[in-house]
């Protein structure tokens, strides 16, 4: 029998698979992508829904694991020999590139999920040959199994690499759970080719080199900057501007940036031994027999002395496997001449090098090489802001070591959220401002009777249901599941910058907070035994009480879950600049958009919902409920499809799907008029109308518009509301 005809499906229907067919988005490229709300579904996780990574990690013998990692550093393998017999530089780069994709604008990227294992990151040009680092780690991952995630192991390997070469790290916190499929919610740029320069179509730059938000890298497929300079132009001063912009977008200030660049380049080398054209395809494009290994190099042995990765070739200092101040000794000790590597990349070589500063070859002890610097490295010498910082570190090695230790810890933990999420015996005791610290609970909590009393006080205070709901939503909905920042805990809505955000209606917010503050003060003064309620708790409780009252008005008796225990942060514990990035440019749940963007309002809604870890049904029921509760920013009437506002009804869906209404554009919004009389019935935004326009969302809206869905609507709204109110309650999860 012909092998090609053995499959009955292929014989009957041809040999094309469904993957070769045009997808819906190929036919309709502007179709709203709701898939990002359902990625990482339980069905994709081989460990099962009941797997508790934190519990598993807490059984790990971290000391034994670290000893195995230390041993790995010098266990050079013939299939990928270690430079100078030590893999330290490779593992530092792996950890750095795992964490370094983080960006502050939306909190996405970073090392918190082990996403370097999957496309596109596993095949980014800047991640060349990091597949080898992960293969070197596999025997250790295999040994320790589920006690250590890939995400944690990659970061820990970087720490152990530093420690094995004489550096004292600041600490390590575990707790990064792995994902099992590529992330679809992250926008990496619009370019259609790797490493596209800024003059190419769909550039991420506009105007005077203005980098598109939320991006934090200068070219598609790079972590930060082009080491050869902007678009490959070897200009150290211009490179300094790129370095500053990209590192700032990863939450690093100038001192942290200098420490990271210099500290990271204290170790290892860059690889550009041969013609890049001799390097094979990346892992995702490699043939099946390569078994996921990419960048197979046909130059010489393909590894060791013949390795080509970035195209830049050489080491920065004479002792690349030991922590010392040699990087600054070289940077300031020599003049630098522009040259090209064997791979053709721009780099700089030290002139008139002393014999003791010549660097032994990484694989041939009979050879030595002068130190090299990249264009980006030289920005630390020629940028007017970086240069004095670098010289201070050069003169004060202890300050440099401390700055690098802290910056490395921040780099590798920035996307993990509050310190309470860190696991293991090496978590530093010191609270750091970028961790968004919140005071520890220091008083007895309110009980069920107190909760009932406080609800009654809030509802009798004169603050409306709409105001209570709006305030609670504004407080809780700052949460981002991308980097676990924001949320209601801390009551930072009463502090700068959140109290002044336009979306939070500062005047109304101040009034509500004043009333709630008086209730809090009165209750705490009268409560026995030191019992207290925090303002953070009272803000959420007020919203819960309002939802219950609105449900009663619709004929439904429901109890909204409430768990006390939130605390109030101080202004001193709140970095205003750091929190500024949490200000929403749009919040479709409140029908708010700061300005017109290239991205549609409905896409911004889905993006917000994804950051809130909501499913499409949860997003749908929340929008419908918040509209009728009157939570729109500025009291806008758009989308308030009800004649009984502040009542938790399914009116939004019923009236949206009413075929007696015809919709037409009216400026930036839409008017819904009676098809027969032409009478104006409603106004709406794109966010409102998408629930009738998009086929998937309309299907969900139909469920909630049904005559038998009134109770289900209330029940589902309460569940989704409760989820958002508790997204940052890592203390009770």
Curated annotation (Swiss-Prot):
Molecular functions per Gene Ontology: catalase activity; heme binding; metal ion binding
Species the sequence originates in: Azoarcus sp. (strain BH72)
Cofactor note: Binds 1 heme b (iron(II)-protoporphyrin IX) group per dimer.
Gene assigned in the entry: katG
Keyword set includes Cytoplasm: no
Family of the protein in this entry: Belongs to the peroxidase family. Peroxidase/catalase subfamily.
UniProt-listed InterPro entries: Catalase_peroxidase, Haem_peroxidase, Haem_peroxidase_sf, Peroxidases_AS, Peroxidases_heam-ligand_BS
Designated name of the protein: Catalase-peroxidase
Active site per the UniProt annotation: 97
Site of covalent link Tryptophyl-tyrosyl-methioninium (Tyr-Met) (with W-96): 224-250
Keyword Oxidoreductase attributed: yes
Cleavable signal peptide: 1-23
CDD domains per the UniProt record, alphabetical: catalase_peroxidase_1 (cd00649), catalase_peroxidase_2 (cd08200)
Positions bound to heme b: 265
SUPFAM superfamilies membership: Heme-dependent peroxidases
Names of required cofactors: heme b
Transition state stabilizer (site feature) positions: 93
Function: Bifunctional enzyme with both catalase and broad-spectrum peroxidase activity.
PROSITE patterns linked to this entry: PEROXIDASE_1, PEROXIDASE_2, PEROXIDASE_4
Root EC class: oxidoreductase
Subunit structure comment from the entry: Homodimer or homotetramer.
């Amino acid at each position: 029998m012909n092998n090609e005809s053995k499959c009955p499906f292929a014989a009957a229907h041809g040999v094309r698979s469904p993957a070769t067919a045009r997808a819906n988005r190929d036919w309709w490229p502007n179709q709203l992508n709701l898939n990002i709300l359902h990625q990482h579904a339980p069905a994709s996780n081989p460990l099962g829904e009941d797997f508790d990574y934190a519990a598993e990690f807490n059984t790990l013998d971290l000391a034994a694991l670290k000893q195995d990692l230390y041993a790995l550093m010098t266990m050079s393998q013939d299939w990928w020999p270690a430079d100078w017999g030590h893999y330290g530089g490779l593992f530092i780069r792996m950890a750095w590139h795992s964490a370094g994709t983080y960006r502050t604008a939306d909190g996405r990227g970073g090392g918190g999920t082990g996403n370097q294992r999957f496309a596109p990151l596993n095949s980014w040009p800047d991640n060349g040959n990091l597949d080898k680092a992960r293969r070197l780690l596999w025997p250790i991952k295999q040994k320790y199994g589920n006690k250590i995630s890939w995400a944690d192991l990659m970061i820990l390997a970087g720490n152990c690499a530093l420690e094995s070469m004489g550096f004292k790290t600041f600490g390590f916190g575990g707790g990064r759970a792995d994902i099992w499929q590529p992330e679809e919610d992250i926008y990496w740029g619009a370019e259609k080719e790797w490493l596209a320069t800024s003059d190419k179509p769909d550039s991420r730059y506009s105007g005077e080199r203005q980098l598109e938000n939320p991006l934090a890298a200068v070219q598609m497929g790079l972590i930060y900057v082009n080491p050869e300079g902007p678009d490959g132009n070897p200009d150290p001063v211009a490179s300094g501007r790129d370095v500053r912009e990209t590192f700032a977008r990863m939450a690093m200030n100038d001192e942290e940036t200098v420490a990271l660049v210099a500290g990271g380049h204290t170790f290892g080398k860059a690889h550009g031994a041969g013609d890049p054209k001799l390097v094979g395809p990346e892992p995702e494009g490699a043939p099946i027999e390569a078994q996921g290994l990419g960048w197979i190099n046909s130059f010489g042995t393909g590894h060791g002395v013949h390795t080509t990765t970035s195209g830049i070739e050489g080491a920065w200092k004479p002792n690349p496997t030991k922590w010392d101040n040699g990087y600054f000794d070289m940077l300031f000790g020599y003049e630098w001449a522009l040259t090209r590597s064997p791979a053709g990349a721009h780099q700089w070589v030290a002139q008139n090098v002393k014999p003791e500063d010549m660097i032994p070859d990484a694989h041939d002890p009979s050879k030595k090489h002068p130190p090299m610097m990249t264009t980006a490295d030289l920005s630390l010498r020629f940028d007017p802001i970086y240069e004095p910082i670098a010289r201070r570190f050069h003169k004060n090695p202890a300050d440099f070591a401390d700055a690098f230790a802290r910056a490395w810890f921040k780099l590798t933990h920035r996307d993990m959220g509050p310190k309470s999420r860190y696991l293991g015996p090496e978590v530093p005791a010191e609270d750091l401002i970028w961790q968004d610290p919140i005071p520890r609970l220091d008083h007895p909590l309110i009980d069920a009777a107190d909760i009932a009393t406080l609800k009654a006080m809030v509802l009798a205070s004169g603050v409306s249901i709409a105001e209570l709901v709006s305030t609670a939503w504004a407080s809780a909905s700052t949460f981002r599941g991308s980097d676990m920042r924001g949320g209601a805990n801390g009551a930072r809505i009463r502090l700068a910058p959140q109290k002044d955000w336009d979306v939070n209606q500062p005047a109304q917010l101040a009034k509500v907070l004043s009333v709630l503050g008086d209730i809090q003060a009165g209750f705490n003064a009268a409560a026995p035994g030191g019992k207290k309620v925090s303002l953070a708790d009272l803000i959420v409780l007020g919203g819960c009480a309002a939802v219950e009252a609105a449900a009663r008005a619709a004929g439904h008796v429901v109890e909204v879950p409430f768990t006390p225990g939130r605390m109030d942060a101080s202004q001193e514990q709140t970095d205003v600049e750091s929190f500024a990035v949490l200000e929403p440019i749009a919040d479709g749940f409140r029908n708010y958009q700061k300005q017109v963007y290239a991205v549609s309002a409905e896409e911004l809604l889905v993006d917000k919902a994804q950051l809130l870890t909501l499913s499409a049904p949860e997003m749908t029921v929340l929008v419908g409920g918040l509209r009728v509760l009157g939570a729109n920013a500025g009291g806008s009437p758009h989308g308030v499809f009800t004649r009984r506002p502040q009542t938790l009804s399914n009116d939004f869906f019923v009236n949206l799907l009413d075929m007696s209404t015809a919709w037409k554009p009216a400026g930036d919004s839409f008017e819904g008029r009676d098809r027969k009389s032409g009478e104006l019935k409603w106004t709406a935004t794109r966010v409102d109308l998408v629930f009738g326009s998009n086929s998937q969302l309309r299907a969900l809206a139909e469920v909630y518009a049904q005559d038998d869905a009134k109770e289900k609507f209330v029940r589902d709204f309460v569940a989704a509301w409760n989820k958002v109110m508790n997204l940052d309650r890592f203390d009770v999860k």
